[in-house]
């Protein structure tokens, strides 16, 4: 270990200097976290990683839509970024389809003394649930560098951990928990990953990645297990279910064009079975147009999307959360929220004990510096 958490501890806790941060990738999520890092007085951008050659050498401000140059230019040199010995790297590069590469990149930072806050490798939203092939090398890197890694977002993440825990704090008894994302994805520009993973624009006989046995549980089973551990109950089994809805007419949307007979909506869930009943359920209902699958659950008040928690208990509780406003599309707002969840956690992660952590290991409040 060259620089571990202890080296930067006095500076972090003394408040004399901003935390030095690297942004890794500038795609859908990364451009928003990059902008947030630049604009926050408690953070100092010291490096930016870009995957595409057309972004290398460009100023960070240009890559996230800001006018005033930062003097920090994007690079694809991993070793140079690791050598900066930053306090934290915000890792938003798409990793689920390239986990081996992502592991190499992330472990390089962790081993060298740089903490990691991420929005990808979503299996790590609750590390105890993650498979050993992923968890073990990262944990070893944390031990070597004296560093911490935290992965979260809006879903998986906020909607399946912080939101239901807030609702549960108001109950005296909970019989079941339902967490839902119900969203029109039509304006979401992510055909290459979300489109392919969900099977949008394919015929129902083609099984998308998400619906392969075990994949849903590997992702949303983490939040199920986190809630079970918080509640002190044992999940006997995790069940997966999924179904599709095909278009009747041609659908034109930002993500793609869907022909009649092709998948335009999906509904899937992971059910945590406790004492023989589905007690903790994570469900998605995602459409490429609000007119698709009218028989499935829809957001309230005609909204395009909702993250919802329903507690069946004493008392019963339902919380509906919506992102976006008159100036920001709900899908774009969801991406901004995902980026914010990572950036807002930087200080807490830098102050946390070394290792792979989840929401359970961090303070509830991570909002300092937001009102400006």
Which residue ranges define each predicted feature?
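Hydrophobic beta-strand scaffold residues
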Residues: 45, 116, 148-149
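Alpha-helical support elements that line or immediately flank enzyme active sites
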Residues: 158-169
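C-terminal helical cap and adjacent loop that interface with cofactors, partners, or active-site loops
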Residues: 290-291, 298-372
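N-terminal glycine-/serine-/threonine-rich beta1-alpha1-beta2 phosphate-ribose binding loop
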Residues: 2-112, 232
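Conserved active-site and cofactor/substrate-binding residues in soluble primary-metabolism enzymes
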Residues: 24, 28, 32, 84, ...
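Short, ordered loop/turn segments at secondary-structure junctions
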Residues: 51, 95, 114, 120-124, ...
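Rossmann-fold NAD(P)-binding glycine/threonine-rich loop
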Residues: 103-104, 112, 120-147
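Active-site-lining helix/loop region of Rossmann-like oxidoreductase modules
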Residues: 24-25, 168-296, 305-309, 332
């Amino acid at each position: 270990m060259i620089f571990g958490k202890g080296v930067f501890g006095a500076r972090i806790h003394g408040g004399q200097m901003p935390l030095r941060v690297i942004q890794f990738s500038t795609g859908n999520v990364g451009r928003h976290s990059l902008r947030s890092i630049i604009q926050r007085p408690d953070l100092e951008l010291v490096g930016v990683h870009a995957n595409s050659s057309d972004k290398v050498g460009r100023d960070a401000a240009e890559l996230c839509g800001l006018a005033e140059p930062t003097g920090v230019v994007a690079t694809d040199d991993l070793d140079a970024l690791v050598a900066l010995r930053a306090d934290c790297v915000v890792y938003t590069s798409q990793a689920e389809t390239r986990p081996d590469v992502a592991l190499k990149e992330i472990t390089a930072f962790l081993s060298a003394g740089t903490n990691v806050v991420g929005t990808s490798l979503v299996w790590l939203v609750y590390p105890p649930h993650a498979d050993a092939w992923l968890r073990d090398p990262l944990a070893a890197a944390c031990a070597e560098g004296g560093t911490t890694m935290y992965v979260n977002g809006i879903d998986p993440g906020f909607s399946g951990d912080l939101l239901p825990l807030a609702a549960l704090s108001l109950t005296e008894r909970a019989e079941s928990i339902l967490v839902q994302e119900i969203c029109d994805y039509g304006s979401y520009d992510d055909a290459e990953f979300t489109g392919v993973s969900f099977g949008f624009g394919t015929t129902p006989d083609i099984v998308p990645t998400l619906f392969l046995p075990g994949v849903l549980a590997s992702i949303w089973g983490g939040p199920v297990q986190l809630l079970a551990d918080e509640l002190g109950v044992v999940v006997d089994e995790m069940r997966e279910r999924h179904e599709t809805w095909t278009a009747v007419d041609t659908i034109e949307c930002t993500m793609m064009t869907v022909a009649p007979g092709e998948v335009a909506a999906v509904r899937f869930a992971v059910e945590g079975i406790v004492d023989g009943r589905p007690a903790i359920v994570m469900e998605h209902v995602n459409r490429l147009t609000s007119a698709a699958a009218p028989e499935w659950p829809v957001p309230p008040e005609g909204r395009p999307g909702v993250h919802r928690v329903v507690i069946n208990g004493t008392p019963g509780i339902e919380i509906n959360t919506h992102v976006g406003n008159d100036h920001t599309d709900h899908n774009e707002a969801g991406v901004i929220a995902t980026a914010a969840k990572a950036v807002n956690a930087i200080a807490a992660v830098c102050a946390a004990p070394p290792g792979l952590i989840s929401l359970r290991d961090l303070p509830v409040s991570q909002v300092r510096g937001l009102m400006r």
